[in-house]
Regions:
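A sequence-level detector of short, solvent-exposed, charge-rich linear segments
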Residues: 56, 78, 82, 112-113, ...
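Short amphipathic alpha-helical segments that mediate assembly, nucleic-acid/protein binding
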Residues: 8-9, 153-156, 204-207
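N-terminal low-complexity, intrinsically disordered segments
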Residues: 2-83
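Extended, Lys/Arg-enriched charged tracts that mediate electrostatic binding to polyanionic substrates
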Residues: 80-100, 192-214
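A recognition module on extended beta-rich or small alphabeta surfaces enriched in W/G with H and D/E
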Residues: 114-200
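Aromatic- and glycine-enriched beta-alpha-beta binding-site module
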Residues: 81-129
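Generic structural signal for hydrophobic core residues of well-folded globular domains
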Residues: 66, 97-98, 133-137
Length: 218
């Protein structure tokens, strides 16, 4: 166990859930891919990623250096590994900012792995985000979205729509996705504070039911 890094964003206290918690170990498959990302970036840039949010621009820079980044089908296995590595690292950075857990369903692919916040209902697939950043286009079926319950999802979407438009070159970056995530978590925390309630842990079953319904046609 290692100590959780304090994020420094006062607005997200409700999503953090109180005092700093011990950071649980990541699932082995996530930890291995994130470590592989650290090694790959070190080889390319000579810099050691440290799982700090300030390292995310370095991750974006690393992707710009990859040869043949566009969409040649023959590079699918290579792109898949890069997406899995960088997504795992991105998820681990987020997990050091906010209490969250990885959910890995048996037989699922890396793009299906979810990071689920513990004290506010917010979940996403870091590897799906990585695919969008890597290919610079939206993932099918909204796989890289930040998943929220209704009516919160619509309310957050309205607030995001009121923000200044982001240039396309910035939109498909990990740095921009992290900024949007922090804003979203801050708004969720604001709602909890205004309600006067203390943050309560969200059970895994609530997320599981949400995604079951999402996958059910009709």
């Amino acid at each position: 166990m290692t100590g959780r890094r304090k994020g420094g964003e006062a607005a997200v206290e409700a999503c953090v859930g109180g005092p700093a918690e011990a950071l649980e170990e990541a699932p082995p498959e996530v930890a291995d891919l994130a470590a592989a990302c650290v090694r790959a970036v070190h080889r390319a840039l000579g810099v050691e990623l440290d799982y700090d949010p300030d390292s995310i621009p370095l991750l974006d820079h690393y992707l710009t250096l990859l040869p043949n980044r566009p969409r040649e089908p023959t590079r699918e296995p290579v792109r898949g590994l890069v997406a899995a590595m960088t997504g795992a690292y991105f998820g681990e950075v987020v997990r050091r900012l906010f209490p969250a857990r990885w959910t890995i369903e048996p037989g699922g692919e890396a793009v299906d792995w979810r990071l689920e916040f513990r004290y506010c209902f917010l979940a996403f697939s870091p590897v799906a985000v990585a695919w969008e950043v890597l290919l610079r286009c939206d993932a099918p079926d909204g796989a890289a979205a930040y998943f929220l319950e209704e009516p919160t999802r619509g309310q957050v979407a309205e607030r995001l729509d009121r923000l200044p438009r982001v240039p396309i070159d910035d939109y498909y970056t990990f740095a921009q996705r992290l900024e949007t995530l922090v804003l979203t978590a801050g708004w969720l925390a604001e709602r909890v504070r205004q309600s006067g309630r203390s943050p309560r842990p969200i059970e895994p079953e609530r997320y599981a039911e949400f995604f079951r319904r999402l996958r059910t046609p009709g």
